[in-house]
Amino acid sequence: MNEIYLIGLGNPGKKYSKSRHNIGFLVLENLSKKYNANFLLKDKLKSSCSEFKINNSTYRLFLPNTFMNNSGDAVRAIVDWYKINLDQLFIIVDDKDLPLGKIRFRKKGSSGGHNGLKSIIEQLQTHNFNRIRIGIGSPPLIKGTNTSNTISHVLGNISLEEKSILDKVYERLIESLSLIHI
């Protein structure tokens, strides 16, 4: 049996539920709905968890209950509990340096300035894990300056225009995830 572990990064709580920074959560919530798989809180994993099977593959989904900057705590707990080979692990994360809706897959790499990935790299003591980055676009420049407010952008809610683009991205990504075989 092939086992795939998908961890979506985001911040817990209603306040952040529709924010750009919660793209990882939103992808897995859409995936779980498609396969009628409910999330259950598992304190020992510091996450809400769900799973489903497609053919000979089991997909385990995790939404960390830690805040983004401490995502590594939950990832470490999950990796240790399931004794995961890192080839089986996929981290789904927002990326402000990619255009809205662009998907980028990497088998290894730096945090790219993303604090959630930085936390995971610190906890796992390696850069060698799969990550699926989803573009949320760059923050707009502050009027009359050459600077932008990154925090306001990533923590800001997804607009209706962005949602229509991201809904298509979720569908493409969900179709792609079902093709993963380790």
PLM regions and their residue ranges:
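Nucleotide and nucleotide-moiety/phosphate-recognizing core
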Residues: 2-107, 118, 122-133, 139-152, ...
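Intrinsically disordered, low-complexity regions enriched in acidic/Ser/Thr/Pro/Gln residues
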Residues: 154-157
